[in-house]
Curated annotation (Swiss-Prot):
One MF annotation (Gene Ontology) recorded for this entry: ATP binding
Membrane topology field: Single-pass membrane protein
A GO cellular component annotation in the UniProt record: plasma membrane
Annotated compartments: Cell membrane
Function: Catalyzes the condensation of 2 ATP molecules into cyclic di-AMP (c-di-AMP), a second messenger used to regulate differing processes in different bacteria.
GO biological process, one term: cAMP biosynthetic process
Top enzyme class: transferase
Originating gene: dacB
Reactions listed under catalytic activity: 2 ATP = 3',3'-c-di-AMP + 2 diphosphate
Gene3D superfamilies tied to this protein: DNA integrity scanning protein, DisA, N-terminal domain (3.40.1700.10)
Protein name: Diadenylate cyclase
Length: 202
């Protein structure tokens, strides 16, 4: 009589053979292989696209809220060049990006986190109260220390840095050592954000 152990081994062997034959069929059949690849690629892209969309929405909302209340802020988005050395200067965290959290960080002027920058990597906050080198450029007198820091960082790497002036409430972006004022209209602002975050800095 067949023992339980022998029966279990036979079942495992059969399962392995079925899996191996299925894999072989997929590899040999171009149409099936293409379907499997498209399916898994589509799932990955769907998740990635959803994360992107949520981040764009949250960043737009954050900048508009900070702008409306004239809360000074600087938010650096890591690109291809690592910002790890600046992450280490500040307080390392791991947190989802949310308007409520960002407003809380920058709102309290008595907080040690108020003046530093927030660094974002892969749609998550990885550091708060980080500091960047100041630019040596002669810039408009209306720009403050946050703008100088944003320019200083982007002169050295491909990060995209968003700044809100606590004096005027204006929203700006710094890219490759150049600073530009952004729109205060929600739809237009989001279009600009998507442009700067998806176009490779030149």
């Amino acid at each position: 009589m067949m023992t339980v152990e022998v029966f279990s081994v036979i079942i495992l062997v059969l399962l392995f053979l079925i899996l191996a034959l299925t894999l072989l069929f997929v590899l040999l059949n171009k149409r099936t292989r293409s379907f499997v690849i498209r399916t898994f690629t589509g799932l990955f892209r769907s998740k990635h696209t959803t994360s992107q969309k949520n981040f764009y929405d949250n960043l737009t909302s954050t900048l508009l809220r900070l702008s409306t209340d004239k809360i000074g802020a600087i938010i650096a988005i890591e690109n291809q060049d690592s910002l790890e050395s600046y992450v280490n200067i500040g307080y390392r965290v791991t947190s989802d990006f949310s308007p409520e959290l960002l407003v809380t960080i920058f709102y309290n002027k008595q907080s040690p986190l108020h003046d530093g920058a927030v660094i974002v990597r892969d749609y998550q906050i990885v550091s708060v109260s980080s500091y960047f080198p100041m630019t040596r450029q002669l810039i408009d007198v209306s720009y403050g220390s946050r703008h100088r820091s944003a320019l200083g960082l982007t002169e050295k790497c491909d990060a995209i840095v968003f700044i809100v002036s606590e004096t005027t409430g204006k929203i700006s972006v710094a890219v490759r050592g150049v600073i530009k004022t952004l729109s205060s209209n929600s739809d237009r602002l989001q279009d600009q954000i998507i442009h700067y975050l998806t176009v490779k800095p030149g």
